[in-house]
């Protein structure tokens, strides 16, 4: 809330305050590589292996440089510096290129550093990548498992569904035992029935540990696709460090887990 500004910013207490503090005080060159959607693949593969990486089909600086004839029938376009501009193409012959261009070009203009002072993004060169279209045989779309890791220790995760429509989206925080966590987010409805635990959950936890070691806080996002674990992305400041927790005291409880000294 607004009381955040009144507190001494050099003595952060809550989770959100500590993420704000880290934004200003914890700046390492490799962070740029870790949040760049193209470069992160190489970084992550060097730690957990190439088999967990969704293949890249191409990288471009401008939408008009994309040679669609070179791409397969199905693919995904995204911007390397932004989590908003996502174009999922299931059938190239039906792709609305004009709409895709508009979405990607809007995303290319977003700068997380200017918007939320998220330093890792400051030096990310905005590019467009095409990735292989991944589909789970269940046909239920991909579920993202987002692990909240504190110095290499995953304590909670959240799963979400249908995030493209805020009214019907569901989001729940879970413990490492796949039980409902004692907190949530005030801006999303929770699942009434928890989604099933992924079959490769233990492997996911191991991967989250390997990728988050040495960082006071890191969110590690993973997919399970056809019983295989794939890397999604790494995030230093979820919600830019303005996560609306309910009950509110969990902002401070999670803050205790972030060791910044």
Where do the model's predicted regions map?
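Short, solvent-exposed loop/turn elements at beta->coil junctions and helix N-caps
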Residues: 60-65, 133-136, 223
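Short, flexible loop/turn elements at secondary-structure junctions
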Residues: 60, 81, 132-134, 149-151, ...
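Phosphate-binding site of ATP-dependent enzymes
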Residues: 71, 95-187, 229
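A conserved helix-loop-beta module that forms one wall/lid of the active-site cleft
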Residues: 11-93, 99, 106-119, 127
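A long amphipathic alpha-helix within ATP-dependent nucleotide-binding catalytic cores
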Residues: 123-128, 171-229
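Short catalytic/ligand-binding loop motif for oxyanion handling, primarily in non-cytosolic enzymes
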Residues: 41, 64-67, 83-88, 97, ...
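Short, small-residue-biased leader/transition segments that mark boundaries at the very start
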Residues: 1-6
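C-terminal active-site "lid" helix and adjoining low-complexity regulatory extension at the edge
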Residues: 206, 224-261
């Amino acid at each position: 809330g607004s009381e955040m500004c009144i507190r001494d910013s050099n003595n952060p207490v809550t989770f959100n305050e500590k993420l704000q503090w880290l934004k200003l005080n914890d700046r390492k060159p490799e962070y740029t590589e870790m949040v760049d959607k193209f470069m992160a693949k190489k970084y992550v593969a060097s730690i957990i292996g190439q088999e967990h990486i969704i293949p890249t089909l191409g990288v471009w600086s401008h939408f008009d440089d994309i040679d669609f004839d070179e791409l397969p029938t199905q693919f995904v376009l995204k911007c390397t510096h932004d989590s908003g501009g996502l174009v999922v193409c299931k059938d190239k012959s039906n792709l609305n290129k004009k709409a895709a261009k508009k979405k990607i070009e809007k995303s290319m203009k977003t700068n997380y550093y200017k918007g939320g002072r998220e330093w890792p993004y400051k030096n990310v060169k905005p590019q467009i990548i095409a990735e292989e279209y991944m589909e789970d045989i269940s046909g239920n779309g991909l579920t993202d498992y987002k692990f909240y890791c504190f110095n290499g220790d995953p304590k909670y995760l959240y799963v979400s569904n249908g995030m493209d429509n805020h009214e019907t989206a569901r989001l729940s925080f879970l413990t490492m035992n796949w039980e409902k966590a004692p907190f949530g987010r005030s801006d999303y409805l929770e699942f009434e029935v928890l989604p099933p635990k992924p079959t490769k959950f233990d492997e996911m936890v191991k991967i989250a540990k390997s990728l988050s070691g040495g960082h006071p806080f890191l969110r590690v996002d993973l997919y399970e696709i056809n019983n295989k674990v794939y890397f999604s992305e790494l995030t230093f400041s979820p919600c830019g460090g303005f996560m609306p927790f309910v009950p509110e005291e969990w902002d401070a409880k999670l803050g205790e887990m972030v060791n910044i000294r």
